[in-house]
């Protein structure tokens, strides 16, 4: 089952977001929800999305239903060892590489926002995950030159998208996986 079969359509979600007065793209909303999930928000995600996007007020069913769909599909993809998890970026043939790069930057910015809400001490995270978070901060600020070769930019963009995907999976693994307790009972040595 592919992720696109259970996600709301990108353009349909864009239309609903606009109709509901939400100044976010579907990529940004997916980044926010992904950040919340990867940070371990659990059942609080809806309240957090309402707080961050609508002054704490719940959305109408017209928007709540596709957002629930987006959350569930994303959560399921992340829990499936991440193999199905993909960034929700515009894919249409008429979307330029520059628009996709802008969508990626928006996704990353909102991912970091969601992650920061659930993990307020992100700057203290060390190791591989800390490095990935620092890289995401840099990626969120990347720009491009419209005079660049579009094929070369497209290839570079795909590599960055894959890196961001793996960084998100690493964050999910770091912040949501609880190490399993061991069943081994250590016995203290007995003195005879």
Swiss-Prot record:
The record's annotation in InterPro entries points to: YgfB-like, YgfB-like_sf
| Pfam families for this protein | UPF0149 (PF03695)
GO terms under cellular component: cytosol
Q: Which domain of life is it from?
A: Bacteria
Q: Which PANTHER family match?
A: UPF0149 PROTEIN YGFB (PTHR37528:SF1)
Name the family: Belongs to the UPF0149 family.
The protein's name: UPF0149 protein ETA_28040
Originating organism: Erwinia tasmaniensis (strain DSM 17950 / CFBP 7177 / CIP 109463 / NCPPB 4357 / Et1/99)
């Amino acid at each position: 089952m592919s992720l696109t079969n259970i996600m709301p359509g990108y353009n349909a979600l864009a239309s609903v977001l606009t109709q509901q007065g939400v100044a976010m793209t579907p990529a940004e909303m997916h980044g926010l929800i992904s950040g919340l999930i990867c940070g371990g928000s659990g059942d609080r995600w809806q309240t957090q999305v309402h707080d961050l996007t609508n002054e704490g007020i719940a959305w109408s069913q017209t928007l709540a239903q596709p957002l629930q769909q987006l959350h569930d599909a994303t959560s399921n993809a992340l829990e499936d060892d991440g193999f199905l998890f993909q960034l929700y970026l515009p894919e249409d043939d008429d979307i330029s590489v520059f628009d996709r790069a802008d969508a990626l930057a928006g996704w990353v910015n909102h991912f970091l926002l969601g992650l920061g809400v659930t993990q307020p001490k992100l700057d203290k995270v060390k190791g591989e995950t800390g490095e990935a978070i620092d890289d995401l901060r840099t990626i969120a600020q990347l720009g491009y030159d419209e005079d660049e070769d579009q094929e070369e930019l497209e290839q570079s963009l795909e590599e960055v998208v894959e890196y961001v995907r793996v960084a998100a999976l690493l964050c999910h693994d770091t912040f949501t996986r609880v190490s399993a307790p061991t069943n081994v009972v250590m016995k203290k040595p007995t003195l005879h």
